[in-house]
Regions:
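Active-site-adjacent structural elements that line small-molecule/cofactor binding pockets in enzymes
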Residues: 1-319
Length: 319
């Protein structure tokens, strides 16, 4: 079965380009991905860096303003957030932001949403971080506000957590009826139900082929109960990748690239690594489990030859 490929920039920490402007490097990577045939580029929406990726004090530009700048710097490639915590911004303001970026990009935006999980990040910025049940209900209401603001001439929504009244959002997004919504997370009772009810895509944060197949089976069940189309939901997986010609290069790269906030077993568990042949075999197992779209990330993404090798030697096998 075919699969598509997007690229995530998990960080704006570029050790081999430390003296360059961080956004300039990110833009160069995005433009290279566009030239190589990647379908999309994704940015994390965090307020500062998370330790399993890089030190907290490393640069991490704000997601949506960066996506707007990337939209103005590209012509074809789709652009998305992976993912935005519902509690970071008022959903009515986020609707305005995303509508604008969809106009700037001429209809290339994908809006990734999640409930949020970094309690210390919310607290550092003075944002509420309620218990998980409340965060899930706020996520659902936030999506409802987005849909209202994107599609209604004057939006009104009365929820427990969010309200908009006769709100005008103009210009509307280019994409009709609205930009696609991606929901991230593997929560089986609520997250997957929200995907089944509202979203056009779902992101699996990782997992073995067997785990992915099981989670997608739960999603299918939610779709059946709600009467929505499981096949119309794009099944994506965040997939860190590390190219290595042999075990010696693999060990050396792990030593160099494993973040201080992680460890080698965790790094190996979440990263698909090896030669193009070995990586392709591992990706094929995930395709067989139901994954349709890989959002790959490279720990050394600023070394653009990695992107070129992957695009030349791996991506065509899934065309």
């Amino acid at each position: 079965m075919p699969a598509q490929f997007g690229l995530q920039l998990p960080s704006f920490s570029f050790p081999t380009r430390a003296n360059d402007n961080v956004f300039d490097v990110g833009r160069e990577i995005t433009q290279t991905a566009e030239e190589l045939g990647f379908d999309s580029v994704w940015l994390m929406d965090h307020l500062f860096q998370i330790p399993v990726v890089a030190p907290e004090t490393d640069p991490l530009p704000e997601c949506w303003s960066s996506l707007a700048a990337l939209a103005a710097s590209t012509t074809r490639i789709k652009l998305g957030s992976l993912v935005s915590a519902a509690g970071f911004r008022s959903p009515s303001i986020l609707a305005k932001i995303t509508s604008t970026i969809d106009v700037v990009s001429h209809g290339r935006l994908i809006v990734g949403m999640g409930a949020g999980w970094c309690d210390w990040e919310h607290k550092a910025y003075g944002l509420d971080f309620p218990e998980v049940g409340v965060r899930m209900r706020k996520l659902e209401e936030a999506i409802q506000v987005l849909l209202a603001m994107w599609t209604q001439e004057r939006a009104t929504f009365e929820g427990k957590y969010y309200q908009v009244r006769d709100a005008v959002n103009s210009p509307k997004p280019v994409q009709k009826p609205h930009p696609p919504i991606l929901v991230g997370g593997n929560g089986e009772k609520v997250t997957l139900r929200i995907t089944a009810q509202y979203a056009q895509a779902h992101n699996l944060g990782g997992g073995t082929p067997e785990e992915c197949a099981r989670v997608l089976g739960v999603l299918r069940g939610h779709c059946q109960r709600l009467g929505t189309d499981y096949d119309a939901i794009l099944k994506t997986r965040l997939t860190p990748v590390m190219l290595a010609a042999d075990k010696a290069e693999e060990a050396a790269k792990i030593q160099r690239l494993c973040p201080a906030g992680s460890n080698e077993p965790h790094f190996r568990n979440r990263t698909i690594m090896g030669t193009p042949d070995q990586i392709s075999q591992q990706l094929q197992a995930l395709v067989d489990a139901g994954v349709e779209y890989f959002i790959v990330s490279f720990w050394d993404v600023e070394e653009l030859d990695n992107l070129r090798t992957f695009a030349r030697e791996v991506m065509p096998r899934f065309a």
